[in-house]
Curated annotation (Swiss-Prot):
The gene is RTC1. GO terms for molecular function: zinc ion binding. It comes from Saccharomyces cerevisiae (strain YJM789). Keywords: Metal-binding, Phosphoprotein, Repeat, Vacuole, WD repeat, Zinc, Zinc-finger. One of its GO terms (cellular component) is cytosol. Residues 945-956, 1009-1021 have a biased composition (Basic and acidic residues). This is Restriction of telomere capping protein 1. InterPro entries: WD40/YVTN_repeat-like_dom_sf (IPR015943), WD40_repeat_CS (IPR019775), WD40_repeat_dom_sf (IPR036322), WD40_rpt (IPR001680), WDR24 (IPR037590), WDR59_RTC1-like_RING_Znf (IPR049566), Znf_RING (IPR001841), Znf_RING/FYVE/PHD (IPR013083). Residues 1-39, 559-593, 600-619, 630-651, 736-758, 783-824, 935-956, 1007-1037 are annotated as: Disordered. One of its GO terms (biological process) is positive regulation of TORC1 signaling. A zinc finger (RING-type) spans 1294-1335. Belongs to the WD repeat RTC1 family. The lineage of its organism: Eukaryota, Fungi, Dikarya, Ascomycota, Saccharomycotina. May be involved in a process influencing telomere capping. It is found in: Vacuole.
């Protein structure tokens, strides 16, 4: 194959020269081996095979494993088998290593052991066999480049103290150092072996290069030139042909940079030009023809890029690629390659220049977010690949063709480096988008395109080397940016790379090795990766993630097209000749530029690109500087149409990524299982419950996730506060209006008294609404109401009311007939409060039902029954509230304890009209005969319509009885007594027939009834005297034994937890008749038994007096008639009354116990048994309603519950608990402070003082004095019963802030120490310790 003089990428011949069999060859020469400075176990050893002509593997030891077992850089998974080093024995197995022979025996024993490593991932994994060149030198290496002479297989490597010419032999696969230009006295020989250790005389001074050493070789006529940084600011040019010790290889030195040089490059077309860039932000172009002296301090062109340090600068390459077509062979080249160059800067900007107009950059791209480190041009297209410290490799289009306007990218943002021309460009909308971005994950320091022609940019290969710890060179195909095509592993991190041709690539590493690979023999990453994978989508296993993709390739198949941006020619144009001047200095690019400078401007060139906006250069002779304030040339042609940012600047994708399919497999399976196999779910629940029983932690986590802890909804606090304030104002106005109206009809008082009454109304309303502790309490309000009711009953005969008493009670005002119309306004507010209470009850009932079902799912029947008990008790309260109707007469006539139970939760006793004495035998029945013990009660004491009907008829029938004088009986009373006597005789006869005996187990004394009569405020002294005059009944016969009845718990435990049918359960007379309505039930407080005893007395008149005294007020009170058992005993006046009152038993049914008392008992049981979840749940739901315990204890319990949630990583539930918690500052001091453990100074035990804390807390609860808790502290120890160290000055316990004197260690109060040292100006310790303690 004939090669063009400009062709750089010479191909390796298909057939290689065979190696002689009877010849022992090593990749390191014999002389080189003998001249090594060290010959220990880590040095190289020669392995001779008896019948082998092939070289052995290089190292006798395995290289250290610098990379992890699995690498995830760039998102590519590579098993260890694929990442095995090319230098490992297992990496070159005998069956695939062309350099090791499988037959024969070793003639000399050595330490080398060849091991084959089995691939556990894939049995078809290809091993690497592409490493064909490798050698190790004893000099530090930092840069490598190829010799652009097709007749010499040469490489140039440079380091801090080394500049060597190396030649590699494809025949014997060896690399040899031919000449070292830094050590001319070294005994180097091109015939045989080479020595890397220079034999210097003692007086010879060794030259050193710059620490940032870059090496480049020339092209064409300057192919024998080597450029290297001799020092930080100079470029030295050496001649490869002067390799003898007599000749001086140094041609010239170029030194005009004021700071360190980072990069330089030879022009492939105009080979006499060299460009350089450095830290001084200047680009300098040198013409080697004009710099023939040994040292040159002036460059031909100098471009100042303002403030950005230049990291890399490159000419556009000028490759000539030969191809065949219908007309024969032709050569493709780029006419612009001799003029264009690009630079990348510390700021991340990429600048493209045209040498014909150097005063203005053509393109400015913000390529990287951090410093840009390197760049490289595509061999035949106008693309530039850049690498930066941000770990990205970006591909940018920098062409000028009009059809690629969408690829034109402007400078955007604030540019601190270059001064852009004065134009009206709107940079805010201009954006820079690369055509392709490869995320490497490490800073990219070196990158090189494969020197091969490609019509499609995505079929190009790009070699990348990093500055990190990755001991590899990655070769990417732009068609696959996520998976590299080849990964070339080395012993140590790579420092540089160079392509010799399309197939051969060399690199150097930190281990001073030079390695060469044939990429055609290297396996691709896709060949060693699995073709599909399936994994769980998340940690909990909720779904599968499956990726399936064909193996594909690294190329994009497209029809072959002729390049549009290149011009077909037989020979690439060399230099630009000036026909008017034959001087070589005035020929070519530099000559044209100089001629242009001699005229008015830079427009003397014939432009080969669209006109761009140019700024006027400010230069002296040959120096150019980009000026920001200069006017532009050809302003008329400064068209900005091509600079308009496009909207679709998106990164192109050559190969579509694989399709990712996600399936919620567990959810699908659960749906199938629930629909077709329902019984399997029950088995799973049983297994889960059994596992939870064995693991308390899992049970706690499950309950914390499933239970409901709060019924509070999110709301706007400010809005609710405003609404409440408006309602309060309206309520106060209504009360004042009602009071004023009533005052007009009664006796008028002074204005001062009216103002005081208004203040009392406002105070009482605010206290009731917001629970203010000042000036009044709920008990005071209740007492005022009770006193008003009593005064009303006492003065019922006179009908005279005191105005202050009426105005102090809203209920008495609304009950008066004179304010009947105005009290309706208050009813609306009462109804709103009632609806709020009902809604709260409904929420609590739903939460209780849910919690019961949660406990039932894990077979925790104890807690299940507890929540069912709470739910049913709340259902009783809800039934009473919904069944009670708000009457216009007594809508606001509520007990104070009813509202307080709901709003403040005070433990108040319910006011009773007929108090009873405490008996010793009332333990069982006392909790069942309390009247309406629920906390949430209706806002009216008036019974429902169904209850009013029988009561009202009863009042009409007994109206005459109510007004009978108690002194003399009349005929009606005799008739009633006669009927009562006949009824009693009939029952006695029936009992006698049954053979039952009369028992006298129950005895009620007469003074019991006298005590009841004295407590009735409406009875007159005359009635009381007549009542005391009645004889004492000695015994009461029991007519019928008490029948067996079901308890409340037995009744409701048999119900289903899914619902509650209140009407059905209450309406069942056989099962759910309350004992207070049982006609013949016996209890210590039974009034039926007392009535039966009255019938047996001889004095019927006195018996009737007592009967009438009890019956009249009971029947006259519509509130207590249907609900008190006392009224039932007095209904035996006639059979008709008995029948009517029997209907009330079916309607009226009080709850068996008080809800507040029940929940308190459950809370105490939960705390005693250590049921944390139930305790916290009760506090969350009922603390603000019933005041289960003290607020501090509730907050402390919730805070500890939060710590438990954090301990078991239930952070979401803990956040919800804090969000919906009814209390503030739950965490208290633990939220922002750390706990400190204190140990006793005497006994050494941890000071907790829990026993004294409980004792003081109990004392504070009993006495109600919270100051008792101030005695508690950690200044004493419960274990040894002694105080800790006292103050050194006052000898009192140290309870608060403590100061310590450092020299002696004495402690004292802050105030005491302050007074001693600061106020009294003392310098010694108060304890008399020697030395100065404070200065």
């Amino acid at each position: 194959m004939s090669l063009s003089p400009h062709v750089e990428n010479a191909s390796i011949p298909k057939g290689s020269t065979p190696i002689p069999k009877n010849r022992n060859v090593s990749s390191i020469g014999k002389g080189e081996f003998l001249g090594s400075s060290s010959s220990n176990n880590s040095s190289f050893r020669m392995n001779h095979y008896s019948n082998s002509g092939q070289p052995s593997v290089l190292d006798s030891i395995r290289r250290p494993n610098l990379t992890p077992t699995f690498s995830y850089s760039n998102g590519v998974y590579m098993p260890e088998s694929h990442r095995t080093s090319s230098f490992n024995d297992s990496y070159l197995p005998y069956d695939k290593n062309p350099y090791a022979k499988t037959t024969g025996s070793m003639s000399n024993k050595s330490n080398m052991k060849i091991k084959t490593k089995k691939n556990a991932i894939n049995t078809n994994t290809r091993k690497s066999s592409g490493l064909i060149y490798t050698t190790k030198v004893d000099k530090e290496l930092s840069s490598i480049d190829k010799v652009n002479d097709p007749n010499i297989n040469g490489l140039v490597c440079a380091g801090k103290t080394h500049l060597g010419l190396y030649k590699f032999s494809p025949s014997d696969r060896s690399i040899k150092c031919v000449h070292d230009f830094i050590t001319p006295n070294s005994n180097t020989s091109t015939r045989g072996t080479t020595s890397l250790l220079p034999k210097l005389s003692k007086r010879t001074r060794q030259n050193k290069f710059s620490t940032i050493a870059d090496v480049k070789t020339g092209f064409n006529n300057y192919k024998n030139c080597i450029a290297v940084c001799n020092n930080s600011t100079a470029i030295s040019i050496y001649d490869l042909n002067k390799s003898s010790s007599i000749d001086n290889p140094l041609i010239t030195s170029l030194c005009e940079h004021t700071r360190s040089i980072n990069s330089f490059d030879f022009n492939m077309v105009e080979s006499n030009l060299i460009i350089s860039g450095g830290q001084d932000s200047c680009v300098k172009i040198w013409d080697l023809r004009s710099n023939k002296s040994k040292s040159s301090n002036r460059s031909d062109i100098s471009i100042n890029t303002a403030s950005d340090s230049i990291r890399d600068v490159k000419w556009m390459p000028g490759y000539n690629f030969a191809s065949k077509n219908d007309q024969g062979s032709s050569t493709y080249g780029n006419l612009k390659s001799g003029y264009k160059f690009a630079s990348i800067h510390d700021s991340g900007y990429l600048l493209k220049f045209d040498l014909r107009q150097p005063a203005q950059y053509e393109k400015k791209l913000n390529a990287h977010t951090g410093p840009g480190l390197c760049l490289n041009w595509h061999p035949n297209q106008e693309y530039i690949a850049t690498g930066g410290r941000d770990g990205k490799c970006c591909l940018w289009f920098v062409g000028d063709n009009a059809n690629a306007a969408e690829n034109t990218v402007l400078n955007y943002g604030n540019s601190p480096s270059l001064h852009a021309p004065n134009t009206s460009l709107n940079n805010s909308g201009s954006l820079a988008f690369p055509k392709l971005t490869i995320n490497t994950g490490y800073p990219v320091t070196k990158l090189k395109f494969k020197p091969a022609y490609s019509s499609n940019i995505y079929n190009s290969l790009l070699g990348i080397s990093s500055m990190g710890d990755e001991a590899e060179v990655r070769i990417y195909s732009l068609a696959r940016k996520y998976i590299p095509k080849h990964v070339l592993l080395s012993e140590t991190p790579s420092l540089g790379l160079v392509w010799w041709d399309e197939n051969l690539i060399f690199n150097i590493d930190k281990g001073t090795r030079i390695n060469g690979w044939d990429i055609n023999k290297e396996p691709t990453v896709l060949e060693n990766l699995s073709k599909n994978t399936t994994t769980w989508r998340d940690l909990d296993g909720n779904g599968l993630l499956s990726v399936d993709q064909e193996i594909g390739s690294y190329e994009v198949v497209e029809p072959e097209l002729q390049p549009t941006s290149s011009t077909t020619c037989k020979k690439h144009p060399g230099t630009i000749k000036n026909p008017k001047n034959g001087n070589p200095e005035n020929q070519g690019i530099i000559g044209g530029i100089k001629k242009g400078f001699s005229h008015t401007g830079l427009t003397s060139f014939t432009p080969e690109r669209p006109p761009t906006l140019k700024a006027g250069p400010t230069f002296s002779t040959k120096s150019l500087t980009l000026a920001s304030g200069a006017s532009s040339f050809n302003s008329s042609s400064a068209s900005l149409t091509s600079l308009t940012p496009q909207t679709e600047n998106r990164e192109e994708i050559a190969i579509e990524p694989p399709c990712i399919i996600t399936l919620d497999i567990p959810q699908i399976f659960n749906n199938i299982r629930l629909t077709k196999i329902a019984h399997s779910r029950k088995k799973n629940v049983i297994s889960e419950s059994s596992s939870m029983k064995n693991s308390p932690v899992e049970k706690f986590k499950y309950l914390a996730r499933q239970l409901k802890f709060s019924y509070i909804r999110e709301h706007n606090v400010s809005d609710s506060a405003d609404t409440a304030y408006k309602n309060d104002i309206e309520n106060i106005d209504v009360v004042k209006n009602a009071t004023e109206t009533h005052g007009d009809n009664t006796t008028t008082t002074n204005n001062n008294d009216d103002d005081d009454d208004d203040d009392k109304i406002i105070e009482s309303h605010l206290l009731k609404k917001y629970n203010f502790p000042e000036n009044n309490t709920w008990a005071t309000l209740m007492n005022e109401k009770v006193n008003n009711k009593k005064s009303k009953r006492n003065s019922s005969s006179s009908r005279e009311f005191d105005e202050k008493d009426v105005r102090s009670s809203i209920s008495s005002i609304s009950a008066s007939r004179q304010s009947h119309d105005r009290s309706r306004k208050i009813d609306k507010n009462v109804e709103a409060e009632l609806q709020e209470k009902i809604q709260t009850l409904v929420d609590l009932i739903s939460i209780a039902t849910h919690n019961a079902s949660v406990y039932l799912s894990i077979d925790d029947l104890t807690n299940f029954k507890i929540w069912i008990l709470i739910r049913d008790s709340l259902l009783w309260d809800l039934k009473w509230m919904t069944s009670s109707q708000i009457s216009s007469d007594n809508a606001s006539n509520m007990d104070a304890n009813e509202s307080s139970d709901f709003e403040a939760g005070e433990n108040l006793k319910t006011g009773k009209e007929f108090p009873e004495e405490d008996g010793a035998g009332t333990s069982g029945a006392e909790s069942l005969v309390e009247e309406r013990p629920q906390a949430f009660r209706a806002n009216s004491d008036e019974p429902s319509d169904a209850e009013k009907k029988p009561v009202s008829k009863l009042k009409e029938q007994l109206k005459n009885t109510e007004i009978i004088p108690y002194a003399q009986p009349n005929e009606d009373s005799d008739e009633v007594l006669t009927k009562l006597k006949e009824l009693q005789n009939q029952r006695l006869e029936s009992r006698t027939k049954m053979g039952e005996t009369v028992s006298d187990d129950v005895i009620i004394e007469e003074d019991e009834h006298e005590h009841q009569e004295e407590e009735q405020p409406h009875d007159s002294p005359t009635k009381s005297a007549q009542f005391h005059a009645s004889p004492i009944a000695k015994s009461i016969p029991i007519l019928q034994k008490r029948e067996h009845r079901k308890s409340f718990i037995d009744t409701f435990m048999l119900h289903s937890p899914n619902g509650y049918n209140g009407d059905t359960d209450i309406g069942n007379e056989d099962d759910n008749i309350s004992p207070r309505f049982t006609y013949n039930s016996v209890s210590p407080r039974s009034k039926v038994s007392s009535l039966q005893s009255y019938a047996t007395t001889t004095s019927q008149l006195e018996t009737f007096k007592k009967l009438s005294s009890h019956t009249a007020p009971i029947i006259g009170s519509p509130r207590h008639a249907p609900s008190r058992p006392d009224s039932i005993g007095r209904e035996q006046l006639s059979s008709s009354l008995t029948k009517k009152l029997a209907k009330c038993k079916k309607i009226i049914a009080d709850p068996p116990w008080d809800t507040k008392k029940l929940i308190k008992q459950l809370y105490n049981q939960a705390t005693e048994t250590g049921n944390v979840v139930l305790t916290v749940n009760i506090l969350f739901l009922f603390q603000t309603i019933y005041q289960i315990t003290e607020i501090d204890i509730a907050k402390d319990a919730i805070a500890h519950f939060l710590l438990l949630l954090h301990r078991y990583e239930l952070f979401g539930i803990a956040a919800d608990v804090l969000k919906y918690c009814p209390f503030e500052d739950i965490m208290g001091s633990e939220g922002d402070q750390s706990s400190i453990r204190l140990f006793c100074e005497r006994c050494g035990e941890l000071i907790t003082n829990e026993s004294s804390k409980e004792k003081l807390r109990a004392e504070a609860q009993q006495t109600g004095n919270k100051k008792i808790m101030d005695k508690f502290g950690y200044w004493y120890c419960d274990s040894c019963k002694k105080k800790n160290t006292s103050c050194v000055l006052c000898e009192r316990p140290l309870k608060k802030l403590t100061m310590v004197i450092l020299p002696c260690g004495h402690e004292g109060h802050f105030q005491c120490i302050q007074e001693w040292f600061l106020d009294e100006n003392e310098q010694e310790c108060p304890g008399g310790c020697p030395g100065v303690a404070f200065i």
